[in-house]
């Protein structure tokens, strides 16, 4: 897999976070944590802070990311703490999920794909969640002006309310919009959804 510009930038960010010891859950991960149970797929896990927190709460976690830097760190932590985490480097644009999970999580990932890929991967995550399980998805949405980490020719800003529409046939447990300042005068506009798959 050839690293994309965004993967290289995240490698740099992760290296800086490790140097600074900044391993706190971000606000979206903190929101997700109470909904994680059973076997968890963390799709775009970054440094694995959420995967570690979930494993400490009794979950088993499959954690995937395109950053070798991040996965190397997570493997080290999981081994050191004897946590049930399988951490793998994967090209998440094309990765095929081959098992069902009790929880699927994708925080801050899908916007780095072109739109057809983002939608296809979202549908794949939906289809590999067991009935009664939770999906936790966080994306950048239209209105975002912070684009410096995104490939100009291949990114996806979801429409406002689009996540809720894509989960209309599930029970929506949480649907939040939030904004954060980016660099300069830019804005990051996010939507986060937690949805329960019908069944059980």
Predicted regions, residues:
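Class I (Rossmann-like) S-adenosyl-L-methionine-dependent methyltransferase catalytic domain
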Residues: 1-37, 46-96, 113-120, 124, ...
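Conserved beta-strand/loop positions that form the S-adenosyl-L-methionine
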Residues: 43
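A conserved beta-strand element that flanks and buttresses the S-adenosyl-L-methionine
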Residues: 105
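Short catalytic micro-motifs in class I SAM-dependent methyltransferases
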Residues: 108-109
